[in-house]
């Protein structure tokens, strides 16, 4: 069974374009995004690799690393990365897992039989404790949105640091702007206290169960 939200990322040793690596140990103390792609030398995957590389510094500023994966041999990865450098003048700096036997893909649930035998476009967001915090799947015909993946990483970090929840489209929510959601109270006393804080201007509330604040 593929790992689910809240599970620890499985311990695996992989072959990559940067040599052998042990996951999640290689990224100990960091967030990391593992993303799978269907195949090397394909147009949509090429646009994604360029997009990930162009935003790589933004990920690293969030203490987050990137690592790709597909069921291709490491030689294919290397030649494709060379092609991207030669033709598009983009140097791919993050490692790419060569899962030519499909072992890692099977372990992580990256092959969806109804969509073929290649890996789907999956995204695993893993925190510094090696806990899987988000999983996103895209079909082969749809490339990923870097803004959303970066937003998810940053939002999870803000949530962890402040004990809050993040609204839709944060930080540009239609109701609360760039504010964050205070988790609903779990007792009558806490609900009353919440409304008193709202009256005092410490927080804002639409109702006792829907309160938010700036951070």
Swiss-Prot record:
It is an enzyme of class 1 (oxidoreductase). PROSITE patterns: THIOREDOXIN_2. Residues 3-158 form the Thioredoxin domain. NCBIfam families: PRK13189.1 (NF009668). The active site is a conserved redox-active cysteine residue, the peroxidatic cysteine (C(P)), which makes the nucleophilic attack on the peroxide substrate. The peroxide oxidizes the C(P)-SH to cysteine sulfenic acid (C(P)-SOH), which then reacts with another cysteine residue, the resolving cysteine (C(R)), to form a disulfide bridge. The disulfide is subsequently reduced by an appropriate electron donor to complete the catalytic cycle. This is Peroxiredoxin. Keywords: Antioxidant, Cytoplasm, Disulfide bond, Oxidoreductase, Peroxidase, Redox-active center. Substrate binds at residue 121. It holds the Pfam family 1-cysPrx_C. Gene3D superfamilies: Antioxidant, Horf6, Chain A, domain2, Glutaredoxin. The active site is at 45 (cysteine sulfenic acid (-soh) intermediate). It comes from Archaeoglobus fulgidus (strain ATCC 49558 / DSM 4304 / JCM 9628 / NBRC 100126 / VC-16). One of its GO terms (cellular component) is cytosol. InterPro entries: AhpC/TSA, Peroxiredoxin, Peroxiredoxin_AhpC-typ, Peroxiredoxin_C, Peroxiredoxin_TDXH, PRX_1cys, Thioredoxin-like_sf, Thioredoxin_domain. Thiol-specific peroxidase that catalyzes the reduction of hydrogen peroxide and organic hydroperoxides to water and alcohols, respectively. Plays a role in cell protection against oxidative stress by detoxifying peroxides. GO terms for molecular function: thioredoxin peroxidase activity. Homodecamer. Pentamer of dimers that assemble into a ring structure. Its EC number is 1.11.1.24. It comes from the Archaea.
């Amino acid at each position: 069974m593929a790992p689910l939200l809240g599970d620890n990322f499985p311990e695996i040793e992989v072959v990559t374009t940067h040599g052998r690596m042990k996951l999640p140990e290689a990224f100990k103390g960091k967030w990391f995004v593992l993303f799978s792609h269907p195949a090397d030398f394909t147009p949509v995957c090429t646009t994604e690799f360029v997009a990930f590389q162009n935003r790589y510094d933004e990920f690293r500023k969030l203490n987050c690393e990137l690592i790709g994966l597909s069921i291709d041999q490491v030689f294919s990865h290397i030649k494709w990365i060379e092609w991207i450098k030669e033709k598009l003048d983009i140097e791919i700096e993050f490692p790419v897992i060569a899962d030519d036997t499909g072992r890692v893909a099977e372990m992580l649930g990256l092959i969806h039989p109804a969509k073929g035998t290649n890996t789907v476009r999956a995204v695993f967001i893993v925190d510094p404790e090696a806990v899987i915090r988000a999983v996103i799947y895209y079909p082969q015909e749809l490339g990923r949105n870097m803004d959303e993946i970066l937003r998810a990483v940053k939002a999870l970090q803000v949530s962890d640091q402040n004990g809050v929840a993040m609204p839709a489209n944060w930080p540009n929510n239609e109701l609360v702007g760039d504010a964050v959601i205070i988790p609903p109270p779990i007792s009558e006393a806490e609900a009353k206290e919440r409304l008193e804080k709202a009256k005092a201007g410490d927080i804002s509330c639409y109702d006792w169960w829907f309160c938010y604040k700036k951070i």
